[in-house]
Structure formats: C-alpha cells, structure tokens
C-alpha cells in the first residue's frame, strides 16, 4: 500500500462511528493495530465472496445496506449535495442490476465474480467526489439519457395516461357493481 493510501486508510479507521468504535475496542483488548484487524476482516470477506455459500447475498447486502442507510441520513439532512451523490449511486446501481440480470447466469460461474462485483459497488459508493457512480453516470449513463430523454418522456407520459384511463375505468366499474349489489340487496330484504 502506498504511504498516501495507508494514511487515508488509517484516518478513515479513526473517524468516529460505530465500526471504528468496535475496532478501537478490539484493538484495546487484543493489542493488535486496528489497521491489521480491518485488513484481516476485509481479507476474510473477500475470501468468503470467492468461496462462501451465499456470496451473492453478502455482496448485495454490502451494495445495498450501507448506501440505503446513508441515503436515509442524506434525505434527513439539510444539505442537498449528499442527496445528489446518493441518487447518482442508486441510478448506477439500478442500471447495473438490470445489466446483471441478463448476464448473471454466465457471470456467477466465475469464481471471483462476487468479489469483483462487491469491489465495483464499493468503488461506486466510495466517499469521494469522483467515485465510480459519479464517473459512470457522467461518462456513460447521462449522455445516453440526454440523447433519449424526449422519447422516454413520451413513452412514460403515454403509459401514465393509459394507466390513469384504466384506473378510472376500473373505478367506474367497481362503483357501478357496488351500486348494483346494494340495489339487489335492498330488493331481497
């Protein structure tokens, strides 16, 4: 590990949160530096993602759990920059999930797939302004979206209008059936 990366990693491990509190307790009880404990845990998770049963679930929990928690905190904060960061992550996560749906049958047979997927998701959620989600959104997803935005808007409007028409028709039929049912009930009493 380069000196700069090691320093950033060490600073990250000394930030105040529940995970670093746990690392501090483990460090105090064992006498082992928290950096080594964290690297050991990372190594075990990586090995589990390669060889473990349920690696898919663990990978999806990592890719969903922390971002969902931080997204809820972002919604509740007055700062809107973090909202944009996490909305960007969820857009990339959604696009990746759709792409993965069609390729998962083949990719899941590769031994390092879930470890690489987990690494990809961690890169996308990295706490930096130029993380993977931002890069992929800016360079891939956004240009495609802007190119097809008007066509997608048109399709969405058509589907929304048809759904409203269908809901109105169903509501009208339910009201009519209710009136008929109540009318038949009054006649029988």
UniProtKB/Swiss-Prot annotation:
<protein>
    <recommendedName>
        <fullName>Receptor expression-enhancing protein 5</fullName>
    </recommendedName>
</protein>
<dbReference type="GO" id="GO:0033017">
    <property type="term" value="C:sarcoplasmic reticulum membrane"/>
</dbReference>
<feature type="topological domain" description="Lumenal">
    <location>
        <begin position="104"/>
        <end position="105"/>
    </location>
</feature>
<feature type="transmembrane region" description="Helical">
    <location>
        <begin position="106"/>
        <end position="123"/>
    </location>
</feature>
<feature type="transmembrane region" description="Helical">
    <location>
        <begin position="35"/>
        <end position="51"/>
    </location>
</feature>
<feature type="topological domain" description="Lumenal">
    <location>
        <begin position="52"/>
        <end position="53"/>
    </location>
</feature>
<keyword id="KW-0472">Membrane</keyword>
<feature type="transmembrane region" description="Helical">
    <location>
        <begin position="54"/>
        <end position="74"/>
    </location>
</feature>
<keyword id="KW-0812">Transmembrane</keyword>
<comment type="function">
    <text>Plays an essential role in heart function and development by regulating the organization and function of the sarcoplasmic reticulum in cardiomyocytes.</text>
</comment>
<feature type="transmembrane region" description="Helical">
    <location>
        <begin position="85"/>
        <end position="103"/>
    </location>
</feature>
<keyword id="KW-1133">Transmembrane helix</keyword>
<comment type="subunit">
    <text>Monomer. Homodimer; maybe disulfide-linked. Homotrimer. Interacts with ATL1. Interacts with ATL2. Interacts with ATL3. Interacts with CKAP4. Interacts with RTN4 (isoforms A and B). Interacts with ZFYVE27.</text>
</comment>
<dbReference type="Pfam" id="PF03134">
    <property type="entry name" value="TB2_DP1_HVA22"/>
</dbReference>
<dbReference type="GO" id="GO:0014701">
    <property type="term" value="C:junctional sarcoplasmic reticulum membrane"/>
</dbReference>
<keyword id="KW-0256">Endoplasmic reticulum</keyword>
<comment type="similarity">
    <text>Belongs to the DP1 family.</text>
</comment>
<feature type="topological domain" description="Cytoplasmic">
    <location>
        <begin position="124"/>
        <end position="189"/>
    </location>
</feature>
<dbReference type="GO" id="GO:0005783">
    <property type="term" value="C:endoplasmic reticulum"/>
</dbReference>
<feature type="topological domain" description="Cytoplasmic">
    <location>
        <begin position="75"/>
        <end position="84"/>
    </location>
</feature>
<dbReference type="GO" id="GO:0071782">
    <property type="term" value="C:endoplasmic reticulum tubular network"/>
</dbReference>
<feature type="topological domain" description="Cytoplasmic">
    <location>
        <begin position="1"/>
        <end position="34"/>
    </location>
</feature>
<dbReference type="InterPro" id="IPR004345">
    <property type="entry name" value="TB2_DP1_HVA22"/>
</dbReference>
<feature type="region of interest" description="Required for dimerization and maintaining endoplasmic reticulum morphology">
    <location>
        <begin position="114"/>
        <end position="185"/>
    </location>
</feature>
<keyword id="KW-0703">Sarcoplasmic reticulum</keyword>
<dbReference type="GO" id="GO:0090158">
    <property type="term" value="P:endoplasmic reticulum membrane organization"/>
</dbReference>
């Amino acid at each position: 590990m380069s000196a700069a990366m090691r320093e950033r990693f060490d600073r990250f491990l000394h930030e105040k949160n529940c995970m670093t509190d746990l690392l501090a307790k483990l460090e105090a009880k064992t006498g082992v530096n928290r950096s080594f404990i964290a690297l050991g845990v990372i190594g075990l998770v990586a090995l589990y993602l390669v060889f473990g049963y349920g690696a898919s679930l663990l990978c999806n929990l990592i890719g969903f759990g922390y971002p969902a928690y931080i997204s809820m905190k972002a919604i509740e904060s007055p700062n809107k920059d973090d909202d944009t960061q996490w909305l960007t992550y969820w857009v990339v996560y959604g696009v990746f999930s759709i792409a993965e749906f069609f390729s998962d049958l083949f990719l899941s047979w590769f031994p390092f797939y879930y470890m690489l997927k987990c690494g990809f998701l961690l890169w996308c959620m990295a706490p930096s302004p130029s993380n993977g989600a931002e890069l992929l959104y800016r360079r891939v997803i956004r240009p495609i979206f802007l190119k097809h935005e008007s066509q997608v808007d048109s399709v969405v409007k058509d589907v929304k209008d048809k759904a409203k028409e269908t809901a109105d028709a169903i509501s009208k039929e339910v009201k009519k059936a209710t009136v008929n049912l109540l009318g038949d009930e009054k006649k029988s009493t």
